[in-house]
Amino acid sequence: MPALLLLTAAGFSGYAALLPVAPLWAVHGGADEAGSGFVNGLLLLATIATQPFVPWLLRRFGTAPVLATGLLFLGGPSLLHLISDQLGWILAMSVLRGFGFGILTVTGSTTLAHLVPPARHGAAIGAYGASIAVPQVVLLPAGPWLVDVAGYWIVFALGAASILGLAATPWLARVLREQDVERLFHDAAAVDSTGADIQAQASGSHPQRRIAGRLARPTILLMGATLAGGALITFAPQMSSAPLAAAGGLAFFTVAAAVSRWRIGSIADRYGAWAFLWPLVLLAVVGLALTALAVENPGDTKVTLFLVALALVGIAYGGIQNLTLLLSLGAVSRNQYGTASAVWNIGFDAGTGIGSVLVGTIAAGLSFPPALLVAAAISLATLPLAFGRERHS
């Protein structure tokens, strides 16, 4: 597992460095809020388009080669941003990076699920979440600040850090061979291909439809949370009149998300996930509403309120990520972990992309406060889905 965590940290370093800065680069080239919102929106659209094919790629080529390809696609285009600040070029780089990010996200969570016994999934997801969150804690707030003090080039250089994860792929490949994890991917394919008709005849319904039904609730809840997070990560540097407030807000957001995602996993292993979901949904709604209030006056950000609001959303953002992945894995059998991981990651990235595009589009026509209130209303609409009982597969 350490090899997977190191590789994941490297990959997400490249992802996090550019997340708030690539939209700023588009604004530097003349794009408006809507155009800059599409930078991350298209990144995640390409991610979502890639993710359904990743389980097949893992079975066909193996985990280490697929991960290496993903890291190259994610980190390689970063320095190419320096060629042009025009929106079309930046969007093309977003597509390439999205391919790599789609591979990294599904492969990482699927491999994690197979490496760790189900009884320890919550704690393992917490550790995996920390390897994702720590780079974001450092690089999300640092990115806009580094642009101000040193220029865009240094952030684009940091974005290439994903390629450093290649050093851990041989180590991970050896661990997977020792634990015979690759065989599990092939066993899953065999079960899916030979057992689907038998299961369907016995139950009177298609098994994939039943799986989709089980995964729908956690996926929609996840989308409500990541819509909020995607909006704040993309636009915090643009919605605050004080650059240091934007950096501080992103720092509060990412630290809160990291701690929440890390700590809640082991707690959920003991008490279950559902008890914590509805309070976290409400926390996200309150945080978004307070953010809207903090940036009501474009020229005078209420800095303290802004920091508190982003921290509240961060707690919800991190906690809901962990709990919904735990519920998704618990809703399926072990040979369906690849499907559950792909669906969860699609929900994560769809919510993030929708938040980026939706809030950017509304802000371009109105302003950020009403855009954030719309995001809060969407998150609130997921609340009825946050009440449930534990299910054991």
Regions found by a protein language model. Give the residues of each.
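Helix-loop boundary and gating motifs at the non-cytosolic
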Residues: M1-G37, R217, L221, T226-P243
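Residue-level signature of mid-helix packing/kink "hotspots" within the transmembrane helices
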Residues: L44-P52, Q136-V137, T254-A258, W262, ...
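Helix-to-loop junctions at the C-terminal end of transmembrane segments
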Residues: T50-G62, S260-A273
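Helix-breaking motifs and short loop linkers at transmembrane-helix boundaries and internal kinks
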Residues: G62, I83-G88, A294-V295
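Structural signature of the two symmetry-related core transmembrane helices
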Residues: P65-L79, A275-L290
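Paired small-residue
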Residues: P77, G88-L96, T304-L312
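Cytoplasmic helix-loop-helix junction between adjacent transmembrane helices
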Residues: V95-A130
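C-terminal membrane-cytosol helix-exit motif in multi-pass small-molecule transporters
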Residues: A160-H186, L385-R389
